């Protein structure tokens, strides 16, 4: 999901090299503007205080749309669906997906950074362990990171407290499918092993992505996302399509009707915003004026 240095957002003047996370969307039949805010799951909540126009965007919108409705995701029945999707088939164990040497390497890393024995995860899909390991790495290496404080959740909570509608661009089922079912188990296993054998690189990339986000530099964030090391650990085009680009296109199809209904604050991961196939460009191609907000 993160990979080749390329200059982006020099595509047109309206989406020029701006260091912004908040964007205004107007025109194309909208009576009042909507806004798009990019988030980052490793960033502290304090980033919102550095975006001076954010309160204006909050005040001028009547609903918040995120990737998911976070309250829905936390319902017991949906938590159960996610837990089930994380489990390996009955005839497969985690250990069976690796050589003994590979398994031992991963076990040592999991013990070091997560403080648990890998044997406890023997029925979990590798993708689920990779996600948990990434959180553990972030907690050890990123100052101020608190997995219990997420920007996406904060925006939805504020909207609910103000009596505004909260909506989601995707279903829980779709996100679960992307996370745990879009890759073969052998590919998930390889990516877990890649993470375990490239811990320093993983931490460095997370740090640089978070620094780029805190600088509100979408250009740099995209460049880091597209970096490649030219081996099997690199994200494939198909994986990027599943994780980023197909979702961008789907959101861009939904948003005209949503924004027409009411002025909307759209809150999605910042990695979805920049580039030729980014959400900002897709909205602009539909005839909207897309402007950075200070």
Describe the predicted segments one by one.
Residues 234-294:
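A cross-kingdom marker for long, charged
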Residues 10-11:
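Short, linear, compositionally biased motifs with a strong N-terminal bias
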Residues 14-16:
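N-terminal signal peptide c-region/cleavage motif recognized by signal peptidases
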Residues 23-24, 254:
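Hydrophobic alpha-helical segments, principally membrane-spanning helices and signal/leader peptides
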Residues 19-21, 276:
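Expand to "…catalyze enediolate/carbanion chemistry for C-C bond making/breaking, isomerization
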């Amino acid at each position: 999901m993160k990979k080749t240095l390329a200059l982006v957002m020099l595509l047109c003047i309206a989406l020029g090299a701006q260091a912004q996370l908040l964007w205004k969307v107007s025109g194309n039949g909208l009576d009042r503007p909507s806004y798009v805010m990019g988030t980052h799951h490793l960033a502290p909540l304090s980033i919102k205080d550095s975006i001076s126009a954010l309160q204006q965007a909050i005040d001028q919108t009547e609903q918040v749309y995120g990737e998911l409705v976070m309250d829905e995701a936390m319902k017991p029945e949906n938590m159960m669906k996610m837990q089930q999707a994380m489990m390996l088939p009955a005839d497969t164990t985690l250990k069976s997906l690796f050589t003994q040497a590979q398994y031992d390497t991963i076990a040592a890393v999991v013990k070091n950074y997560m403080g648990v024995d890998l044997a406890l995860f023997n029925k979990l899909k590798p993708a689920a362990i990779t996600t948990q390991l990434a959180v553990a790495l972030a907690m050890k290496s990123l100052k101020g990171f608190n997995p219990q404080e997420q920007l996406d959740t904060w925006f939805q909570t504020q909207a609910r407290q103000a009596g505004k509608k909260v909506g989601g661009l995707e279903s829980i089922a779709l996100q679960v499918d992307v996370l745990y079912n879009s890759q073969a188990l052998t590919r998930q296993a390889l990516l877990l092993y890649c993470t375990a054998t490239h811990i320093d690189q993983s931490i460095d990339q997370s740090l640089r992505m978070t620094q780029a986000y805190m600088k509100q530099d979408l250009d740099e964030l995209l460049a880091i996302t597209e970096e490649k090391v030219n081996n099997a650990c690199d994200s494939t085009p198909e994986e990027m399509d599943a994780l980023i680009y197909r979702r961008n296109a789907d959101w861009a199809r939904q948003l005209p009707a949503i924004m027409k209904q009411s002025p909307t604050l759209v809150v999605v991961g910042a990695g979805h915003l920049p580039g030729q196939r980014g959400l900002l460009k897709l909205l602009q191609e539909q005839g909207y004026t897309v402007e950075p907000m200070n």
